[in-house]
Amino acid sequence: RTLKEITSIKTGQAVNKQMISANPGEYPVINSGREPLGFIDEWNTDNDPIGITSRGAGVGSVTWQPGKYFRGNLNYSVTIKNPKLVSTRFLYHLLLELQPEIQALCTYDGIPALNASNLKDLLIPIPCPDNPQKSLEIQAEIARILDAFTELTAELTAELTARKKQYNYYRDQLLSFEEGDVEWKTLGDVCDFKNGFAFKSNLFKDTGLPIVRITNINGSGVDMADVKYFDPSDYKENTQSYAIDSGDILIAMSGATTGKIGCFNSNRTAYLNQRVGKFIPKSNALNNRYLYHFLLSKTDAIYVLAGGGAQPNLSSKALMEKILIPIPYANDSTKSTAEQKRIANILDKLDTLTNSITEGLPREIELRQKQYEHYRDQIG
């Protein structure tokens, strides 16, 4: 059946941020995004939770807002005409599955928009349409399964957030030292820094030796899913001096990932692109993993050092001169390296639990999300 056969589609009421600021209250305002635009002192919708964004960057997004709320003029209500034929929660999950089809109905000339007349012709599959009772039972079971996966994913995500906070707390505690037990040194005192090579984009290959670019630095590791390659014979320079090995600590020097740290964990050698830097401890007096965790704690300060703003750009000179690292028991090298190793080992365990794609919670969340999408695909 078409969406217009089973639902009524209407536009909400005009609203803006000034109106919300002037009339603060408890009712969420759902307008051009999945999250509330704000909270206001009046509502115009009750127990009509499904909506679809009609204009703006989030056009075509399916929204769910239970209870009383204010629906804005950039959100279509999708109200079921006969609840004895179609379950609200089933329809919500189905519309999520049909998101690509909804996006295809949108226009993107100027301000992105979704015309209600186009949306109304969207085809909606209803199980066992000739047996309403059986149909509702099937819909209810499908919605129950998908809701269970949604809830589990939310719980895992909350757990992951808590673990990250735990890691940050212990990291900050472990990197705090009593006066006299620590000597603060510049990164330049204890590290060398290697800038990347200007590989030419017109010489990128589909195979060959991998290049690590700033977009590969993800804030803890190096994501090699989207990698460009090169052939050394295309360059007269000695590209071997830009090699990266497993365990090397990298930093993005410009762009959207400026200041993000990544530890390269691959058995295959890769190569530094321009605006990617590599930290090289000057001696065994500095534990590499200790350095890694310290740098993670300084990403905000490093970003500020880069100037922030729309086009942050980090200077290696400023980085190595202005960021100070605490060296415990600096006058006793044996005691210092032992303490650095102890701290790094504790943080490595927490880091693995929090971030590892094979051992930690992100992998569990990914699996549950795939299960959810698999079951949701069955209703499309």
Stretches with model-predicted labels:
Residues 3-7, 27, 75, 88, ...:
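Short, structured motif recognition centered on aromatic/hydrophobic residues
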Residues 1-2, 127-186, 328-380:
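Amphipathic alpha-helical coiled-coil/heptad-repeat segments
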Residues 233-239:
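Short alpha-helix capping/helix-loop boundary micro-motifs
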Residues 1-13, 19-30, 176-196, 364:
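Non-catalytic DNA-recognition/assembly elements of restriction-modification systems
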